[in-house]
C-alpha cells in the first residue's frame, strides 16, 4: 500500500502511486517547457533524474506496512465490526525522505538533484519542517537551487489528491 488509511491503501497501491507521480511530473515538466522562459533551469533535469526521483521517492514504504485486522464500532447499530487494513511496522525509524535516499544509495549512485528531490518531496508535510528552522531553510534552499524538488513535490501532491482515490478500509474490507 501507499498508506495505511489514505490514498492507495490497497495492495499494489504504492506501485500505482509512484507511476501516477511519474506521469504527473512528466506533464508538469512539459507544461513548464510550454511556458517558455521561466526562472528555473529545467535543462538540469534528465529523463533518468525524473524516472529515479518519481518512481523511487517512496521506496521507504516497501515492507513498511503489514496487513492487520482492525476493529471499529458502528455507533448507529452499537455493534463492533472487523475489517482488513494495514498498520505501520517501521524497522528503521528515520525521516521519510532521508530513509528513501539511504535505502537507494545502497543500490545506485544518486545524482545531487535526485537526492534533494527525494529528501524534500514531503515539503511542509515533513515533520522536521514544523519543528526546525534549520530544516525549513534547507528545504527552501533546495527548492530554489533544484527545480526537481518542486516538480516532485507538486507531482506527489497532484497524484495523491487528484489522481488517486482514497478508500475507506472499514467499508471496502469489512469482515463482519
Regions found by a protein language model. Name each.
Residues 3-12, 16-17, 23, 28, ...:
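Divalent metal-dependent catalytic cores for phosphoryl transfer on phosphate-bearing substrates
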Residues 41, 175-176:
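Short acidic DE-rich linear segments
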Residues 74, 171-174:
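A short alpha/beta connector and helix-capping loop motif
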